[in-house]
Amino acid sequence: MLEINDFNAIRISLASPEDIRSWSHGEVTKPETINYRTLKPERDGLFCERIFGPTKDWECFCGKYKRVRYKGVVCDKCGVEVTRAKVRRERMGHINLASPVSHIWFVKGTPSRLGLLLDISPRNLERVLYFASYIIVDVKEDMLQVAREMVQEEYAARREKIQKQAEEKRIELSTQLTQDLGGMETAQRSTQRQIEEDYRRQRDELVGEAERLRERLEEMSGTLADEDIIFRGVTVVEEGELINDNTLDQLDELVEQELEVLEERRRRDLADAELLTDAERERKAYEATQEQERLQERLQRELDMLVREEKEKLEQLDKLKVGLIITENEYRQLRDVAPGVFRADMGAGAIRELLERHLNLDKLAEELQAEIQTSQGQRRKKATKRLRIVEAFRKSGNRPEWMILTVLPVIPPDLRPMVQLDGGRFATSDLNDLYRRVINRNNRLKRLIELNAPEIIVRNEKRMLQEAVDALIDNGRRGRAVSGKGKHRLKSLSDMLKGKQGRFRQNLLGKRVDYSGRSVIVVGPNLQLHQCGLPKKMALELFKPFVMRRLVERGVAHNIKNAKRAVERVRPEVWDALEEVIKDYLVLLNRAPSLHRLSIQAFEAKLIEGSAIQLHPLVCAAFNADFDGDQMAVHVPLSRKAQEEARTRMLSKYNLLSPAHGEPIITPSQDIVLGCYYLTMVRDGAKGTGKRFASIDEAMLAYEKGLIDIQAPIWIRMNGSISGKSDRPVRELPPASDGTPRMVIETTIGRVLLNSELQPPLRFRNRLIDKKGLKEIIADCYQYYTSLRNLSEAQLNEVRAAHGNKHVQELARIYGSEMTAQQADRIKTLGFRYATLGGMTIGIDDIEVPAKKYDIVREAEQQVAEVEKQFRRGLITEEERYQEVVRIWQEATKQTIAAVKENLNPFGPVAMMSTSGARGNINQISQMAGMRGLMSDPTGRIIELPIKANFREGLSVLDYFVSTHGGRKGLADTALRTADAGYLTRRLVDVAQDVIINIEDCGTEEGLWLHSADDGELMEKLQVRMLGRILAAPIYDKTTGELIADRNTEIDEELAEKIIAAGHESVFVRSPLTCQAEHGLCRMCYGRNLATGKLVEIGEAVGIIAAQSIGEPGTQLTLRTFHTGGVASADDITQGLPRVQEIFEARVPKGKALLAEIDGVVQIIREDEGVRKIRIVSTNVYTDEYPLTRGFTPVIESESDVYEGQVIAEGPGGEQIIARLSGKAFIQSDRIIISQEDHEERELVVPHNARIRVENGDRVMAGQQLTDGSANPQELLELQGREAVQRYLVNEAQKVYRSQGVNINDKHIEVIARQMLRRVRIEEPGDTGLLPGELIDSAEFRRLNNDIVSQGGDPATAATVLLGITKASLNTDSFLSAASFQETTRVLTDAAIQGKVDYLRGLKENVVIGKLIPAGTGIEKRLERQHEDLISEMARMLEEVQQAEKSAEPTTTALPTTNGHQAPQSDTDALLRARLEELLSGGNDHDDEEDSDHPDLSSL
């Protein structure tokens, strides 16, 4: 195996099938795990010993070979290699898949990597992979042409056939019509004949009948008719009428008429018959025509349909291209249309074939580049995304088809163990179930393929295999998650990595450790600052191995076994051994939650009886510990290096200052403060008041004799002078003969006692010492003793003797820390002693209710009654009434607090506790003795009924009920806040974890202006803000011009005072925000390390410190948004923790303020519907003057409009003056002025609840706030640029913390802000090979551009991007860091495709792979290694130069040695290295980063 520390970068990429097989020790073919009778692994199963190694050390499966002497032998019977059982943690197996399957990470991620590469939508890709659609994987172009021709021929034949059929039908119709018409002619003639015959017959009948009647009449002529004689219905002769010739004439007439009627009928019938025939003929002709037309239409339809079908089929053939997705129906049709032309398939096999055979990455990259150049909008965006993936594959050497698995790796069995439980049942890792499903399905698929099963069954089995592999890799990512017994979701390989319980966060970034224990803590008031009390039995367990060894060394036990027995029986000698052992070891104490680095500190252990750990009271603040049941963990650092680190860096006495703000964190509190306050109080009129003493000893004697009280004001003569202010009279005396100052001072014995415990340089403090005073003492002590000015050589030598020969600054820090620790311990002892002697207790009688309270309440009640009366009369609204009532009661509460304060006895224990800062404040005392005042309901709205009682008087039921709201909300808030603050800290740590001080100076000229104008209620004074910074430019005295300090000078307390005294209101300092270091920060830009008060050392992990400093006070911040009077208004802006998250996540803030988009003048517009608008008008006037000399005359009118290029004046010789810009021309006696007005307007709609900050006519700048609220940092970046946003982020974060009384130094927020603004987004890539829209580190961007410019190419352009801390963490260069933060699978997917290399520059990535972190003491090794690499590289470069010179100039060369003599060529190598070593060791303090990265070779 490779040596664990023998690499400095780690690469992740896709594994090829060959890689997977090369890792494997054999194929797993059976789903069995172990045999339940023999409890031995099954052969070829998931726990097979042949593949994964033996289950017992040095013993094969069958037992033929046992013992270590057969090491490396492979048993000929069972095939198991004789080796250690632990190989089962590292040996892998594999499964040969019967059908390729896709890797779900590359399919289901967003965006789908496979989909982007193949340009297939994720939905379609899924349909193909899960056997719902076909995808075309191959098209034969030559056969495609043949198929086209065949289709065309087929349709041509079909067209011909149809047309032929139509022609035949047409002829048939025509013949039919002719026949029909002929038949009609015949019928017509027959009808005419019939009519003629009928006519003749009827005529003959008529004539015959007439003849017969005539004959009869002629016979009867001259006679009278004996009856009516009728002819055809007409009476010719009536009865009794005479028959004569007239009668015959009449008959002839009738016959004539009848004949006419017959003739008429004949003509009519003939005409009708003809008409009927014509009509019938026309009908037949019409029907024939219709039929012809129908036939024509049908023909046309059929032809059109054929054309359409042909077109569709040809189109289908034309569309036939590799990668086309088709449904099953379409596949069948196409197969019929073009058999053998194409091949379509389903599943991962089809996709693999596409990737392997048809994806030309180089060609695709060129096409996408061209598309990016020519397209816009969504198309360009998509092309960029695709190009990014294509380029990733091209550069990384990964093959796209490796995203499809043909071989599945099987992880070692000991990483997915199977253990027997008590009841004989087995518990197994979920992975075994998931692997078993894969193997079962794979084996079934193999059998089905062998049996030539129907396609549909095989396809279904392939789909099930795909789903089984999906579940193994990432269960639940697609479809329903596979669940085991009891419905629980099986944990897949991805789940093993993801989340808090995943491999990264559970086992790599956080581990359980041996040599640790935990117990309850109790106070250890007699301990020194660097000590802790460790229970004996706990210590014995922790140091057991060491004690055993010591017992053997001392001869108490003969061997380790005896020693172990002795320890277990706790023989008396064991305790002596333990005492000896423990002297050499420090232990680490840790209290969870570890919110900052002071939550783990090192202590010397003192053995104590009992079972609780004793903790020094002064370190409680750092641990945030109290003694109400808190527990702490103890750890033993084992190695010599770890012990050394604990002793030099982690010992509690070296951690006196808070890294967040540089003030002491070892500050006396509570009892100690109370004791010191009691001691330094002056009680006028106490016993002995006014007495005078010649010396301190005399006064102490009087006190011990009981003549004076400890708090009595007395006069004492003493040597020395007052330190700071004095609250009692002081009279200076002439100095003593040796020059010692002397004075007579009014003080108390208590103050003398306190001062006697102070280090001499800190005396004499003659004032009331409260908590703040004690803090000052500690700070002054540290400052005094760490300043080299105040230390003698003897003191430094004393430290040297104890701590070795270190840098003088480091020695001063150690000495100062030790002196301060001693001082703190002395104050602690004194405070506890006098808190006890003073006997300050608190009882119910100490709380007196002031008589004024009742008057205040009565008056308030009257005012409220008056307001109610006005409301009932309708003079004020409900809202105004509510606001006024709340105001009255708030005022009453204020007055009550004042009355309570006034009423307090300053010497009473309650007042002393409050005013000294030991415990409690005036508000709490007021709740006990005054009135509780107004409460708010669960929404945060103030309830207008106050609680008029106090705790001394007792609350009524209603009062108590109203109080519960606030109490419950407080508890809920605290619980929520803790989790939120923890998560915020985690994100901050993640974004800043690689910010380490790496170099001395980055050489930047940039910096940050600090202005005194920014001083305010919430911001600290300029003098405080500039402390510990490094000047970015020289600073001079304003009046004399004398240099006060040069660039790169650290601003200490003295220099800060000088700068302020010189009247400077702004200082230009270096800042992490402007640091140009490529990785991490440089010392100069960071400045002072607040935890030591000295310039930061190389290797300090300032990013982590910044994150902890911001995150640790997070729990103190309020959670909710504030509601003013319960009514949501524009004031309802987020505060507290949510606001901090809003700032660091760069989110659009709630209640966002409107910002001016351009410089200009404001106009406020109010419209009818209550809509308000702000219009900003920007008018810029440009003028251009043209002198009229030598007889030039204008050719334009004054105040006329002219355009650019127009002639405005001409000279006597025809010379012309041309207008250079368009605008209005004004003619004066000797010149023409053209004035151009540039007019721009922006209109913004004001939200209805926003308060406008500007007035009509105000001038505003771009980026200025127009309404109340918080600005959106993204808009600010756009409008005002990077600097403005940096300033905004720092100031806004500080506002939140300062408003809660939390002090954090600006530079911590600057470190985080720098990380948020580290990236730039590429706009135009130039010749850099970057992609538009790509995010890249700004240092990398600068380096790339410099390289390109030096080669004469076009540089890229980019815009700064503001990322929230979560986004910034995920965009880090280290994939290990990003993957262990969030979205593990997405980060690893991208990193694998890109073949990313992690150079292990941050802390997390080194912790993950188990290397020393590149910070603190861990950076030394790294620097040594870089040093060696640099020397080797430079030596190589020099050799190359010499080789080139040699080949150009064939003379022997010699190099100058360090002393100037010539060295023969043979010694060159050794000489070169020695010279380079010398140069580099001399050049450690580089002024410029570039020097260290690119050494000047000319000097060699």
Curated annotation (Swiss-Prot):
Provenance organism: Chloroflexus aggregans (strain MD-66 / DSM 9485)
EC number: 2.7.7.6
Gene3D superfamilies, A to Z: 1.10.132.30, 1.10.150.390, 1.10.1790.20, 1.10.40.90, 2.40.40.20, 2.40.50.100, RNA polymerase II, clamp domain (4.10.860.120), RNA polymerase Rpb1, domain 3 (1.10.274.100)
Gene Ontology CC: DNA-directed RNA polymerase complex
Residues where Mg(2+) binds: D626, D628, D630
Biased composition, class Polar residues, residue ranges: 1449-1468
Residue sites binding Zn(2+) 1 per the record: C60, C62, C75, C78
GO MF: DNA binding; DNA-directed RNA polymerase activity; magnesium ion binding; zinc ion binding
Name the UniProt record assigns to this protein: DNA-directed RNA polymerase subunit beta'
Keyword presence, Nucleus: no
Name of the gene: rpoC
